């Protein structure tokens, strides 16, 4: 894929970024390098390779879910300034 400075300026315009001519030229060089690398990677035959989700094949050791805290809802609602039907009432902020 080939880009030119017009393409870089168009992308910058769509992103609402102001770029000078020098910045567009520098960005063009960087983007062309990135796109060239992508083209090289796409040219590699990966038909016999299984895709990997992570660089290391590690499984996580899972633990059982255990309740570590008791339900303190009633205690917390007893010290709240205003509660109705189990819900905390707060002052109206927006009119």
From Swiss-Prot:
HAMAP family: GatC. GO terms for biological process: glutaminyl-tRNAGln biosynthesis via transamidation; regulation of translational fidelity; translation. Its EC number is 6.3.5.-. Belongs to the GatC family. Allows the formation of correctly charged Asn-tRNA(Asn) or Gln-tRNA(Gln) through the transamidation of misacylated Asp-tRNA(Asn) or Glu-tRNA(Gln) in organisms which lack either or both of asparaginyl-tRNA or glutaminyl-tRNA synthetases. The reaction takes place in the presence of glutamine and ATP through an activated phospho-Asp-tRNA(Asn) or phospho-Glu-tRNA(Gln). It comes from Methylobacillus flagellatus (strain ATCC 51484 / DSM 6875 / VKM B-1610 / KT). InterPro entries: Asp/Glu-ADT_sf_sub_c, GatC. It catalyses: L-glutamyl-tRNA(Gln) + L-glutamine + ATP + H2O = L-glutaminyl-tRNA(Gln) + L-glutamate + ADP + phosphate + H(+); L-aspartyl-tRNA(Asn) + L-glutamine + ATP + H2O = L-asparaginyl-tRNA(Asn) + L-glutamate + ADP + phosphate + 2 H(+). Keywords: ATP-binding, Ligase, Nucleotide-binding, Protein biosynthesis. Heterotrimer of A, B and C subunits. GO terms for molecular function: asparaginyl-tRNA synthase (glutamine-hydrolyzing) activity; ATP binding; glutaminyl-tRNA synthase (glutamine-hydrolyzing) activity. Gene3D superfamilies: Glu-tRNAGln amidotransferase C subunit, N-terminal domain (1.10.20.60). This is Aspartyl/glutamyl-tRNA(Asn/Gln) amidotransferase subunit C. It comes from the Bacteria. The keyword Ligase applies. It holds the Pfam family GatC.
């Amino acid at each position: 894929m080939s880009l030119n400075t017009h393409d870089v300026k168009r992308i910058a315009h769509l992103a609402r970024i102001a770029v000078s001519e020098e910045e567009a030229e520098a960005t063009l060089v960087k983007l062309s390098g990135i796109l060239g690398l992508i083209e090289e990677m796409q040219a590699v035959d990966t038909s016999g390779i299984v895709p990997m989700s992570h660089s290391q094949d590690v499984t996580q050791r899972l633990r059982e879910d255990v309740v570590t805290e008791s339900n303190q809802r009633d205690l917390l609602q007893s010290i709240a300034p205003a509660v109705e039907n189990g819900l905390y009432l707060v002052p109206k902020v927006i009119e």
